[in-house]
């Protein structure tokens, strides 16, 4: 029996509509709209697309959008100075610096300079630390979005075997923390993992984020498993595909995310949720 599709577009639209309604209620009651500052350095084509999506989503739900498009010649000190200014701006609830940064700029001190209560990407060590201690504050967007997708399957994750393929700071590592928090028995696989197929074949939940087209053969998927494909890869013929061999996996899995239309929309929706959360929990005048 073919897998049920986890429709990220539809779920993300529901999340954004809920945020939009809350923003309307805030404004109607005399409170200000949440504000999101998006910083783009240089003119990387893919980054421009991602930033455009985030800014449109911001405006769609009624946020104030503060746009900073900086030249590729921007220095480390100039970028750090801008972050400090945004930290001190009471109209800004969230600060997002689009990654990757151009060569010559070090992202780590930039991201650590963002105040944790304005770190709506969820990358600051404070927010990662809170997640690891089981007291999450602002959660990393892609893993948070994936957890929302999993909630919509109505599958109880407690005790299930979860395998995360990929150990990046953006997805793999925080994803493992989210799954642990949800009660799953969690394994993280990476480039040094031996017998990757054995790990995947026993997994009730598989999250793949490696950035390699169809890296995971569909035949590895355990019958009935939940498959979350974070990858977004463009083939020579122009088609987009994920990190999992979808056509075969979809015949074995119980649930599966498509590419595109699965995880991607949820990342932006989670960013919007985090910005509202930062505004309400940390910045509203009590």
From Swiss-Prot:
Coiled coil location: none
Catalytic activity: (6R)-5,10-methylene-5,6,7,8-tetrahydrofolate + NADP(+) = (6R)-5,10-methenyltetrahydrofolate + NADPH; (6R)-5,10-methenyltetrahydrofolate + H2O = (6R)-10-formyltetrahydrofolate + H(+)
Organism superkingdom: Bacteria
Subunit description: Homodimer.
Protein name: Bifunctional protein FolD
Keyword annotations of the record: Amino-acid biosynthesis, Histidine biosynthesis, Hydrolase, Methionine biosynthesis, Multifunctional enzyme, NADP, One-carbon metabolism, Oxidoreductase, Purine biosynthesis
GO terms (BP aspect): L-histidine biosynthetic process; methionine biosynthetic process; purine nucleotide biosynthetic process; tetrahydrofolate interconversion
E.C. number(s) listed in UniProt: 1.5.1.5, 3.5.4.9
Function: Catalyzes the oxidation of 5,10-methylenetetrahydrofolate to 5,10-methenyltetrahydrofolate and then the hydrolysis of 5,10-methenyltetrahydrofolate to 10-formyltetrahydrofolate.
Pathway annotation from the record: One-carbon metabolism; tetrahydrofolate interconversion
Lineage summary: Bacteria, Pseudomonadati, Pseudomonadota, Gammaproteobacteria, Alteromonadales
Residue sites binding NADP(+) per the record: 166-168
Assigned GO CC terms: cytosol
Record-linked PROSITE patterns: THF_DHG_CYH_2
CDD domains in alphabetical order: NAD_bind_m-THF_DH_Cyclohyd
The species this protein was found in: Idiomarina loihiensis (strain ATCC BAA-735 / DSM 15497 / L2-TR)
GO MF, one example: methylenetetrahydrofolate dehydrogenase (NADP+) activity
Any one Pfam family match given in the protein's UniProt record, by short name: THF_DHG_CYH
Family of this protein: Belongs to the tetrahydrofolate dehydrogenase/cyclohydrolase family.
């Amino acid at each position: 029996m073919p897998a049920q599709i986890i429709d990220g577009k539809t779920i993300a639209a529901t999340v954004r509509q809920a945020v939009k309604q809350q923003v309307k209620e805030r404004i109607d009651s005399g409170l200000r709209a949440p504000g999101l500052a998006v910083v783009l350095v240089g003119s990387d084509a893919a980054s421009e697309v991602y930033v455009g999506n985030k800014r449109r989503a911001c405006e769609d739900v009624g946020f104030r959008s503060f746009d900073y498009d900086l030249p590729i010649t921007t220095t480390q000190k100039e970028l750090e100075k801008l972050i400090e200014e945004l930290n001190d701006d009471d109209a800004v609830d969230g600060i997002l610096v689009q990654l990757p940064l151009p060569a010559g700029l070090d992202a780590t001190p930039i991201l650590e300079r963002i105040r944790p209560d304005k770190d709506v990407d969820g990358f600051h060590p404070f927010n990662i630390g809170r997640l690891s201690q089981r007291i999450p504050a602002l959660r990393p967007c892609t893993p948070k979005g994936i957890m929302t997708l999993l909630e919509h399957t109505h599958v109880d994750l407690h005790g299930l075997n979860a395998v995360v393929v990929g150990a990046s700071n953006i997805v793999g590592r925080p994803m493992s923390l989210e799954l642990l928090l949800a009660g799953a028995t969690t394994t993280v696989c990476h480039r040094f993992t031996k017998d990757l197929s054995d790990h995947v074949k026993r997994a009730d939940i598989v999250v793949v984020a490696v950035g390699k087209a169809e890296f995971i053969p569909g035949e590895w998927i355990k019958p009935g498993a939940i498959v979350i494909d974070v990858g977004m890869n463009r083939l020579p013929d122009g088609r987009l595909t994920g990190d999992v061999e979808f056509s075969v996996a979809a015949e074995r899995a119980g649930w599966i995310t498509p590419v595109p239309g699965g995880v991607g929309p949820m990342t932006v929706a989670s960013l919007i949720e985090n910005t509202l959360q930062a505004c309400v929990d940390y910045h509203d005048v009590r």
